[in-house]
Amino acid sequence: MSTALNSEHETVRPLASFQPSTWGDLFISYSEDSQLKEVYGKEHECLKQQVKTMLLDVTNYRISEKIAFINTLERLGVSHEFENEIEGLLHQMFDAHSKFQDGIQHFDLFTLGIYFRILRQHGYRIYCDVFNKLKDSNNEFKKELKEDAIGLLSLYEATQVRAHAEEILDEALIFTKAQLESIAATSSLSPFVEKQITHALVQALHKGIPRVESRHFISVYEEDPDKNDLLLRFSKIDYNIVQMLHKQELCHISKWWRDSELETKLTYARNRVAECFLWTLCVYHEPKYSPARLLLGKLINIISCTDDTYDAYGTLEEVQIFTDVIQRLDRSSMEQLPDYMKILYKAVLDLFDEVEVQLSNQETNNTYRMAYAKEELKAIAKCYEKEHIWFRKCHVPPFEEYLENAVVSIGNRLAVTFSFLGMDQVAAVEAFEWAKTDPKMVKSCGKVLRLVDDVMSHEEEDVRGHVATGVECYMKEHGVSREEAVVEFYKRVEYAWKDVNEEFITPNHLHIDLLNRVLNLTRIADVVYKFEDGYTHPEKTLKHHIMALFVDPVPI
């Protein structure tokens, strides 16, 4: 190890001066109220059995009543308690749909919308021709639809799961959005309907973070004049019980962050422990994935620090050595690194050791999975290095060359593979081989994340000195303005979303729980980067969500 790399001699570093954490030590200590947890637990079990009875009873009802009840369970965030029962009902519905499609012609607009959306969100390929009945003889949407606010909202949410070559859904999105905006501005609506419309126009359900959307809907459902009080109370208790677990997990990761010295030794990097855990919670929030969440939460923090090391501190020589060391991933290589990088490299190795222990303790020894995660880490390091070299050389690459690298450096491929590690029962070797091939769904997820990130961050990164974002690359190559480039980016985002939706309903050998991880990663983009770079500047976009998820329980 040369003295030069360990010294603080004059070196030009592209310092970013990121904002400090909003949260301080808020999450580093968590004292669970065991008495309240016990009280909640007893009532939760009692209510769960009653809700399960209601769900089983609904099998004798009409399809419209079945799908409406499932919709309510999912919107309230309690469907994780009844996964098998719900899947059984949906399978029956889809089977009946395939044989007797005439019954759908009698669905009202609200029922048709939730029927289509929910079946697609569970991986069933239901065709968009079910909406043909909404058109008149002039191929326009029937005028009477404009009077049905809750039906229009249901159709609007259904359009969000559209895939390619579904023109009627593209048209329905334009139609419903215009009508809902008009209704919200001019009509006198009940609070129950008004809140749903106002929220949906900002955040579509399909593209939202599931746990965040459930918290919001619980408050909305309280104002439903036809609400089921038992179901409402069950959803509140369930939310608070699961929140206790999430608080405990965030506390664990906060302590790990402190003990790892990443915050104190890598002062140039973003301290975003709570924000990283929000990303983790979007990938999977269900209690059964708690061990997997702890590992993924640590990884996302480490990748954030690694990204900032390449972008906002490391010299060319340092990042080249770090990239080379990452290709080996052995402790003997640590001495080649400058002191500050040793902290980061140690965190990487310690995390992989922790993962290996957890995998070896599963019902079947799944340590083979480690090789896939390591390869993705090596790949992302090479992409970071390439971007650093571009920056040092003031090189603006052709857009497609930039994008090919950037959809890897955004980290979704590594996150997908890592999220599979802790899914003992459903993630067989085929799942890792699938992710390894960079399939269309994963690549499109990366495009959504990268393109919206670039749109929201490119001006700031240009000011502080950073590799050219996709916006600059596209502007230079095509000779267009920033505004024109942004329009093109959002067209590509819409196209990539259709890819994700299409792949989700395309039959393959993967369990739907695995595909949901990719879908959930795509959803992050629509929340974090909707109005600004919410990860770098979380106080406006993410602070409210973090308070709702990790600080404030639902009032009961």
From Swiss-Prot:
Belongs to the terpene synthase family. Catalyzes the conversion of (2E,6E)-farnesyl diphosphate (FPP) into drimenol, a precursor of the sesquiterpenoid polygodial. Polygodial has been shown to be an antifeedant for a number of herbivorous insects. GO terms for biological process: diterpenoid biosynthetic process. Its cofactor is Mg(2+). Its EC number is 4.2.3.194. It catalyses: (2E,6E)-farnesyl diphosphate + H2O = (5S,9S,10S)-drim-7-en-11-ol + diphosphate. Keywords: Lyase, Magnesium, Metal-binding. It comes from Valeriana officinalis. Mg(2+) 3 binds at D453, S457, E461. The Asp-Asp-Xaa-Xaa-Asp/Glu (DDXXD/E) motif is important for the catalytic activity, presumably through binding to Mg(2+). Coiled coil: none annotated. Pathway: Secondary metabolite biosynthesis; terpenoid biosynthesis. The keyword Hydrolase does not apply. InterPro entries: Isoprenoid_synthase_dom_sf, Terpene_cyclase-like_1_C, Terpene_cyclase_plant_C1, Terpene_synth_N, Terpene_synth_N_sf, Terpene_synthase-like, Terpene_synthase_metal-bd, Terpenoid_cyclase/PrenylTrfase. Binds 3 Mg(2+) ions per subunit. One of its GO terms (molecular function) is magnesium ion binding. PANTHER family: ALPHA-HUMULENE_(-)-(E)-BETA-CARYOPHYLLENE SYNTHASE, OS04G0344100 PROTEIN-RELATED. This is (-)-drimenol synthase.
